[in-house]
C-alpha cells in the first residue's frame, strides 16, 4: 500500500477468502447479537446481508445529496454512533455505489466520532485502486493513530484486477486487541 501512504506492519495482516466473508467474520467477532452496525446509505446491499445474517441490527445514516454529490450528515451520524447499542460501523471508502472518495477531514471526523463513542470501523476499501486519478484516495487507517487503532481495513486485488475467482482478501488490523 506504498502508493496510498499506508504503512502496513506484516504482523497486522490477517487473510480471508474475500472481503464479504471478512466483514461477516469481523461482525461476528466484534459485536454481539442484537447490537447495531451502522452503514451510510445508499450502500452496497451485501452489507445488509452480512449484518442481518449474523443476528445484528442495521442502523442507517443516510447520505445527503445536494444536487451534485453525496455528503455525510454528521449530526445524524453522531446521534446514531451515540446509541450504546451501536458497536460497529462499516465505512465504504471509496463509497460504493456513489463512487465518492472521502476527504481527509471527513475521514478524521468519522474517526473522532467513532473513538468518542467506542465504535469500531470496518473499512471496506476494496475499490481503492478504481478511482478517478484526479482525486486522492485516502485510506481511513492512514488519517490518524486514532483511526488506525479503531479500524479493521479490508482490501483485495479481486475488483481492480478482475480476479474474483482467486477468492482472497487481506485484512489490516493494527490494534492487537481487535486482531
What is the role of each PLM region?
Residues 1-112, 129-130, 137-142:
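Conserved core of the PLP fold type I
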Residues 54, 116-117, 147:
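Helix C-cap/helix->beta junction micro-motif
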Residues 88, 120-121, 152:
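Hydrophobic "anchor" residues on beta-strands that sit immediately upstream
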Residues 93, 121-122:
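Residue-level marker for buried hydrophobic side chains located in beta-strands
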Residues 125:
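Walker B catalytic acidic pair
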Residues 134-138, 148-151:
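Substrate-gripping "pore-loop 1 plus following alpha2 helix"
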Residues 144-179:
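Conserved core segment of the aminotransferase class I/II
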